[in-house]
């Protein structure tokens, strides 16, 4: 199952840090990069931050929605869910995007 237009699925994840926890959160998020890039169906997985280094953005590109769904069941993702407690402020956001065919 891919996106409705048959193209890979893009996900933008916004994660805002609790004040004073920016570096700790950055370390936790950075540990996700290597194992995620090795997952089946992962085309791209990149971490960015804003100029204040208090908000982080993952750019994810997956071959199919099934690959993205499988990502949330991996040991490293489950570890992230536990490790981010107390580091992440409210106001995070996940946005699924589909490429527009032209």
Please place each PLM-identified region on the residue numbering.
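Glycine-rich beta-strand-turn "strand-cap" elements at beta-sheet edges
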Residues: 1-7, 46-53, 80-102
